[in-house]
Swiss-Prot record:
GO terms classed as biological process: DNA replication
Record-given protein name: Single-stranded DNA-binding protein 1
InterPro entries membership: NA-bd_OB-fold, Primosome_PriB/ssb, ssDNA-bd
Pfam families from the UniProt entry: SSB
Amino acid sequence: MDATVTVVGNLTADPELRYTATGAAVVNMTIASTPRMYDRQSGEWKDGEPLFLRGILWREYAINAAASLAKGMRVVAVGKLKQRNYETREGDRRTSVELEIDEIGPTLRYATAKCSRATQAGHGVSPDPWADSQTGQGIDSHTTRSEEITENAKNGEGAGKNELNKKVLVGDNVSYEDFDSDEVPF
């Protein structure tokens, strides 16, 4: 049974992107998680002992993390704790615990983030996840007046909320005017 944990902390260095002999991308990083406790006697917050946890990511996920994360960033990581036994050059046996990361990203407590869809050559990932597989047309080709509707609602013009509710994603030759507000599923 794997022990799944969530760790929140700061990256101690930029993620280290390397490639195995077979060409698989791998990233190693260290997350420093320092608990903070309130000392009632002094009336101050104090740092506890930091935990330095080594994390590892593989393949496309490793490439995306290396391109997105940097030293000092506060991140939240979810993964499985793995114990690794090894022998040093001197012949000493050692054990280390690593976090095999399933999910990682910046926390938004003290920062903002903008995300963009990663495209990997040869992996069939479309730059537009909503694109029609046959025509290649994206979502913008299927919406009608969405910017105008949004602007009118902000200015109190038009039908307001009801008009905004009609901003639905529909196929070719169908527009939001074809729906009554009672038919809109939201």
